[in-house]
Regions:
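Short beta-strand to alpha-helix junction loop
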Residues: 76-86, 124-139, 154, 205-213, ...
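Glycine-rich loop(s) and the adjacent beta-strand/alpha-helix scaffold that form part
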Residues: 190-245, 302, 384-404
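Conserved N-terminal glycine-rich FAD pyrophosphate-binding loop of Rossmann-like flavoproteins
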Residues: 34-67, 247
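Glycine-rich Rossmann-fold phosphate-binding loop(s) that bind the pyrophosphate
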Residues: 9-12
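Core beta-strand elements of the Rossmann-like FAD/NAD(P) dinucleotide-binding domain
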Residues: 2-3, 181-190, 366
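An anion/pyrophosphate-binding glycine-rich loop and adjacent beta-alpha core
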Residues: 218, 224-337, 404-410
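Glycine- and aromatic-enriched mobile tails/lids
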Residues: 1-4, 17-20, 24-26, 30, ...
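Conserved redox-cofactor binding core of oxidoreductases
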Residues: 96-182, 187, 194, 235-240
Length: 589
């Protein structure tokens, strides 16, 4: 019997992994919560990094690698990051051949812009809808393989758990069809998770509401390790709103946008004043903390509210339309002001998780046969992600995971199709029993209200500025929520298209993952990248230059630590008030 594979997640990482397997002649089933083209990758705006150096600035894969390690405050393992940066130019050219309509220079070359934390212009972009254009291009390739019978899409399916054989190896998944509510088991010789971010753990973020992290938590509950959970990226520029927060891409600053507030009656460009070498293109963690300082400490937010200006009005309207038309139109639609004429009002928002499932350099988790790639793994960004590295890491992670999953599967003696039915029936039965319990829940608590309470508390204590007292209170509160979750009442018992029952299950998983994030942050007594504690304001390499790894126990997460791979670049002080080279000299003197 031949080998078969399952990919869970229809964003960039999942599509790329499926494509690599199909290219090798393998059979792949691709599961997605939503139609593939509605995956959250479609929301990415700014671009994808690669040191192509068509502008002759002196960029190289090494410079990209150094910027990424430096920007991540030296917490990323260097071997996979170096390989990713070396592969990046070819990935961009591959996407162009697939039909991604990257902006071009007058000479016909792919155009590149500079984003935060980058020393050079290395971000290829398709206006301000790069994620959408790449997602659609990859989906066209997947559809070709569908027509050839090598990929089968199963949309509107949610993975509930993995199936493990008697030796603890992943042999498939149990999933639920969200229309019929049917639960089924599916065999695979290897499973690749590409299930995206965890933004819905926070009340309002730039993420889609499907980004619950529930799949991460499901396999964490089954023994998968979770790494660097404490590193949550807060994007400095989002459009405030009552329902959700809409990202205002870093490309707005890459094209010349300036952040400012009034001070003493005059515009104060505070990032340019404090960080003259990078100005408005400092990394996201730094820009976010400065905006918080201006609004909360200096009380200089617009009209006394927590907002600052992001100004594009000094730039030519034609250029804005050509290069930023998508986000300019979005702001005008949702706010009613024209950014070509008046400054935009923005404020930071939860955006991305640098942490994720622990994987080795082959993208495999500690559960044999279970791989992870994209935002759901922890591998490429350290303590802070640079803009436009997310699309790159998603695609590159998928390119690695596909072939490595195939190599793993082919090395196994017994194909999943020949394993005993009992393993699959037992796990399916466990999930069906759990579903019956969910339907029977008849307590006084409301699941959606519990989610609001949890996500508000996470925003308050586990985002930009963290204190140990606040983190302890948050963990105590999350444990209370776990008890209150047991007293939820289900108000919808329909057996088709039921949205409440899956949400209650997802909420349990979100609370579980929120505890991992909170306790990982509580334990790390230093400030590094996106993790900032005023009580411990400096980076502490002697004690904390290490990866946090969480393992689940019945009493909660147990944390251990793993050394970081530092074989290429020695850690140095991270500064953005001077150029990177000068900062390196200053820290070594």
């Amino acid at each position: 019997m031949g080998r078969s594979y399952i990919v869970v997640g229809g964003g960039l990482a999942g599509l790329m992994a499926a494509i690599k397997l199909a290219e090798a002649g393998q059979r792949v089933r691709l599961f997605s919560l939503v139609p593939v083209r509605r995956s959250h990758s479609v929301c990415a705006q700014g671009g994808i990094n690669g040191a192509v150096n068509t502008k002759g600035e002196g960029d190289s894969a090494w410079e990209h690698f150094d910027d990424t390690i430096y920007g991540g405050d030296f917490l990323a393992n260097q071997t996979p990051v170096k390989a990713m940066c070396e592969a990046a130019p070819d990935i961009i050219y591959m996407l162009a051949r697939m039909g991604v309509p990257f902006n071009r220079t007058p000479e016909g070359n792919i155009d590149f812009r500079r984003l935060g934390g980058a020393s050079y212009s290395r971000t290829a972009f398709a206006g301000s809808t790069t994620g959408q254009q790449i997602l659609y291009a990859l989906d066209e390739q997947v559809r070709r393989f569908e027509a050839e019978g090598r990929i089968e899409k199963l949309e509107h399916w949610e993975m509930l758990s993995v199936v493990k054989d008697g030796e603890g190896r992943c042999a498939g998944i149990v999933a639920q069809h969200l229309k019929s509510m049917r639960i089924g088991d599916f065999r695979a010789d290897a499973v690749i998770l590409a299930t995206g971010g965890i933004g819905y753990i926070y009340r309002r973020s730039t993420n889609s509401v499907i980004n619950t992290g529930s799949a991460h938590a499901a396999v964490y509950r089954q023994g998968a390790s979770y790494a660097n959970a404490e590193f949550i990226q807060i994007h400095p520029t989002a459009i405030p709103g009552d329902d959700k927060l809409r990202l205002m891409s870093e490309s707005a600053r890459g094209e010349g946008g300036r952040i400012w507030v009034y001070r003493d009656g005059k515009p104060w460009y505070f990032l340019e004043d404090k960080y003259p070498a990078y100005g408005n293109l400092v990394p996201r963690d730094i820009a976010t903390r400065e905006i918080f300082h201006v609004c909360y400490d200096l009380k200089l937010g617009i009209g006394g509210e927590n907002m600052v200006y992001l100004d594009l009005s000094h730039l030519p309207a034609e250029r804005l339309q050509e290069r930023l038309g998508g986000i300019v139109g979005m702001y005008e639609k949702f706010v009613g002001d024209d950014p070509r004429k008046v400054p935009m009002k923005i404020f930071p928002a939860m955006h991305y998780s640098m942490g994720g499932l622990w994987v080795d350099f082959d993208q495999m988790t500690n559960i044999p046969g279970l791989f992870a790639c994209g935002e759901c793994d922890y591998q490429y960004h350290g303590a802070n992600r640079l803009g436009a590295n997310s699309l790159l890491s998603a695609i590159y992670g998928g390119m690695v995971a596909g072939p490595k999953a195939m190599a793993y599967a082919e090395a196994q003696r017994t194909p999943a199709g020949e394993l005993a039915e009992s393993w699959f029936a037992a796990e399916r039965g466990r999930q069906e029993a759990e579903q019956r319990q969910l339907y029977a829940m008849d307590g006084p608590e409301n699941a959606y209200r519990l989610h609001v309470e949890m996500s508000d508390r996470m925003v308050e204590h586990v985002t930009v500025v963290r204190t140990n007292a606040g983190l302890r209170q948050t963990d105590d509160f999350l444990q209370e929520l776990q008890e209150r979750w047991r007293r939820i009442g289900i108000d919808d018992r329909s057996t088709e298209h039921n949205r409440t029952v899956p949400f209650v299950r997802q909420l349990r998983n979100m609370i579980e993952l929120a505890r991992v994030i909170t306790l990982s942050a509580l334990n790390r007594n230093e400030s590094r990248g996106a993790h900032y504690k005023p009580e411990f304001p400096e980076r502490d390499d002697a004690n904390w230059l290490k990866t946090t790894i969480a393992t689940r126990t019945p009493d909660g997460p147990v944390l251990r630590y793993e050394d970081v791979d530092l074989q290429f670049i020695a850690p140095r002080q991270r500064r953005y008030d001077v150029s990177k080279a000068k900062g390196a000299v200053a820290s070594g003197s």
